[in-house]
Each structure stands twice: as C-alpha cells, then as structure tokens.
Curated annotation (Swiss-Prot):
GO terms for molecular function: ATP binding; ATP hydrolysis activity; ATP-dependent activity, acting on RNA; helicase activity; RNA binding. Gene3D superfamilies: 1.10.720.10, Nucleic acid-binding proteins (2.40.50.140), P-loop containing nucleotide triphosphate hydrolases (3.40.50.300). This is Transcription termination factor Rho 1. Homohexamer. The homohexamer assembles into an open ring structure. The keyword Cell membrane does not apply. Belongs to the Rho family. It comes from Ehrlichia chaffeensis (strain ATCC CRL-10679 / Arkansas). It comes from the Bacteria. ATP binds at G173, K174, G175, Q176, R177, A178, R185, A186, G187, K188, T189, I190, R216. Pfam families: ATP-synt_ab (PF00006), Rho_N (PF07498), Rho_RNA_bind (PF07497).
C-alpha cells in the first residue's frame, strides 16, 4: 500500500529509487509530481491499494481537490479530485483535512479520485460528531499563557534574550492577535523563527503553521530548516492570486482545527504583502485611498487577522503577524494605519536600536499586551509595571540596553524578578 502524503515528503532521489524497484520507467527530466503520479498509477493498476490525503479546496463549480502542504497548497498534477456528491454527503468545507482510499485516473481523466474517505480532521468516519461552526463560537480574551522563554540548551544561546524580553514586555496568550511592527533589517525574521522554536519546544500540543507571503526563496528554505512545524510559502515572484489562495486555505484549515478544540498558532510574514496581494486581485470599487489602496481591498485581510481568538470551552487561534513600516511606500503606511489598533498585542521594533546592533530591537515603551493581567500573576505584574516606570525615563536605545544587561546576568526571568526584590 502506497501513501500519497508520505511520497510527497520524500526527495526526488528516493522517489527514483522506488520507481526503479517497482519497474516504473522514468527519465531524468521528470518533475517530482510526475514521478509520484506514475508511481501511484502503477501501484493502483497492479491491484494495490493507495491512500491519499490533504486539505480540501472547494472550487466555484462545486467539486474540489485535496491540496498538499508539501506543494504549498498549489494546484498540481498529483492532487486528489473530490466529486460534488462526496462534498455534499460529508458536508465538506474548504480547510477540512481528509484522508482516504484513492483510485488511478482513467484514460480521459487527469487526477486521482477519492473513492472512500477514511477520516475527516483526524477523526474516523465512524466517530464523526457534530461541531459548532467557527463563526458561532464565543470569543474570549486570552487567558492561558504561551511562554516563550526557552531553556533548551542545544539550540538557544544564553546571550539570546529576545523571547525573555517579549515575555516581560508583551506576553502572549492562546488566542492572541499580535502585530510585530518592523522597519527593514530590524530582525523580524529572526524573532519569528525564535517564537516558532519556543512554541514547538514549550507547547508541543499547539499546531504551528508558518505562513510566508512575498518572502525571498532562500528565507523560505531557512525557515523550513529551522522550524519544527508546517511551513508554507508563496514567494515574491509568484502572482498575487497565489498569495491570496494560499492564505485562504491556511486560515480555513486553522478554523476547522479550532472547531475541533485544537490550539493553533499562525505566524504570518507579512500581513502588509498579503494586503498588497488582495489589493491587486479584487475588482476595483472605484474608490481609491492614498497610496493606491482600493477601499474594499483590506476587508479580507482584516477578516484573516480578526479570526484570531480564544474560544470558550476549548480551542484557540493565535495569529502573530508582521507589518512593514518605513519602506518608502505610501501604500505600506496606509496598510499599517488600517491594521494599527486591530490587534490586542503589539511588538514594535525600532530601527535606531538595530542600527546600534542591540538585539532584540524592541521599543519597550511602545510595545505591550492588552489585558496582560489575565496572563501574568499579580506579583510579577507589579514588578513589570515597576520596570516600565523605571525605563520610561530613558530613551528607546538606553532602555533596551539596560534591560538586556540585566537579563544577561540572570539565568531566567524568575531569577531576574527575584533580583528586583534585592
């Protein structure tokens, strides 16, 4: 039995070896999807069973496909077709995670077809239960802390105190809607990688998705190799509709998981480029704001960001997104102004701090979390307020240097707070 999802995770060299063992003829110029297609077709044609899975994307015609995270949810030749009848029978929606038995395409068909579904959203068909739709769930303030301070000695340097600073200045909770406001070369990508690592180490129960929109290909590779979680991307050389399609599938998948009481974190880099993509694909309304932004363009990216919430009786969706400023583009400034105030946590990076090579380049006085008293115990909260009063009289660079020096001589934040007593 061959599993389509497992084949997609293999390298081309491994696939060619499997093809050789099964007697599948392949030349050296075939794409990875073509090799997988011929492998699956060979197994099914010989009477073997094949299993396929992926995330449902329903098209406007009523039928749909199972898209693969390995292909960044883009349309490819090894996608699995789902008929409109099956979609109605199982009440499938875009974002559902489906696995089941598939058959090879006939002469007039182009895709594998789902024959029998085995599980939907990791639940066996026999155990499927009713669930409340995402829009009907009750949102609450974040109550459970996402601790970022990581004591993993293998991968975290003692001199790296970025996560400890965020835990003090702008603590995160499950269901947070956080915005990292960053000028160019201020270290936002490194901070995102460290947040992803801390979540995977400290909170293995959280489903982590890193969504990269409009990034450079080498940064995507670096993120894939440094993050233990799902990393999907649409690079800067891809058209705007691809950015939009990827973002829509990711947010719908996250919603389906939250409906099943899972805790999901999406790290989005960046919401500015996502808003630019929406601006390029939506039909023109005739009303254009400053910088060339259509008045209706920001509604859908706002809906994406606004989906982050803590859910009553279990489940949460946390979105930590970066917003670009000081890029020289008027459009980026307008987009940032529209998103400013929509989150309940802001981490502001300062170019003046990064220019002096002081990291993390966080502006302590401007960064913070709403309702932080629900995440931090009262004793630590009083010390955080005392620290803020002390740092408020300093400039942004001096405040960060002062806090950095104090954190470097302590092992963790608890020791730092104990030191404040003395």
């Amino acid at each position: 039995m061959l599993d389509l999802s497992e084949l997609k995770k293999k390298t081309i060299e491994d696939l060619l070896k499997i093809a050789e063992d099964l007697g599948v003829v392949s030349n050296g110029r075939m794409l990875k999807q073509e090799i997988i297609f011929h492998l699956m077709k060979k197994v099914v044609s010989d009477g073997g069973a094949a299993i396929g899975g992926g995330v449902v994307e329903i098209l406007s015609d009523g039928f749909g496909f199972l898209r693969s995270p390995e292909a960044n949810y883009a349309a490819s030749g090894d996608d699995v077709y789902i008929s409109a009848g099956q979609i109605k029978k199982f009440n499938l929606r875009t974002g559902d995670i489906v696995s089941g038995e598939i058959r090879a395409p006939s002469e007039k068909e182009r895709y594998f077809t789902l024959v029998k579904a085995h599980s939907i959203n990791f639940t066996d068909m026999a155990k499927l239960q009713r669930y409340v739709h995402f829009d009907d769930l009750i949102p609450l303030y974040p109550e459970e802390r996402i601790l970022l301070e990581c004591n993993d000695p293998i991968s975290v340097s003692k001199k790296d105190i970025s996560m400890r600073v965020i835990d003090i200045v702008a603590p995160l909770g499950k269901g947070q809607r956080a915005l990292i406001v960053a000028p160019p070369r201020a270290g936002k990508t490194i901070i995102l990688q460290q947040i992803a690592h801390s979540i995977s180490v400290n909170h293995p129960d959280i489903e982590l998705i890193v969504l990269l929109i409009g990034e450079r290909p080498e940064e995507v590779t670096d993120m894939c190799r440094s993050v233990k979680g799902e990393v999907v991307s649409s690079t800067f050389d891809e058209p705007g509709y691809r950015h939009v399609q990827l973002a829509e599938i990711v947010i719908e998948k996250a919603k389906r998981m939250v409906e099943h009481k899972k805790n999901v974190v999406i790290l989005l880099d960046s919401i500015t480029r996502l808003a630019r993509a929406y601006n390029s694909v939506i039909p023109s309304s005739g009303k254009v704001l400053t910088g060339g932004v259509d008045s209706n363009a920001l509604q859908r990216p706002k809906r994406f960001f606004g989906a982050a919430r803590n859910i009553e009786n279990g489940g949460s969706l946390t979105i930590i997104a970066t917003a670009l400023i000081e890029t020289g583009s008027k459009m980026d400034e307008v987009i940032f102004e529209e998103f400013k105030g929509t989150g309940n946590c802001e981490i502001i990076l300062d170019r003046k701090i990064s220019d002096k090579r002081v990291y993390p380049a966080i502006d302590i006085s401007k960064s913070g979390t709403r309702k932080e008293d629900m995440l931090i115990d009262s004793v630590c909260l009083k010390k955080v307020w005392l620290l803020r009063r002390l740092l408020s009289s300093m400039g942004s660079v001096e405040a960060m240097e002062f806090l950095r020096d104090k954190l470097l001589i302590t092992k963790d934040n608890n020791e730092f707070f104990d030191m404040m007593n003395s």
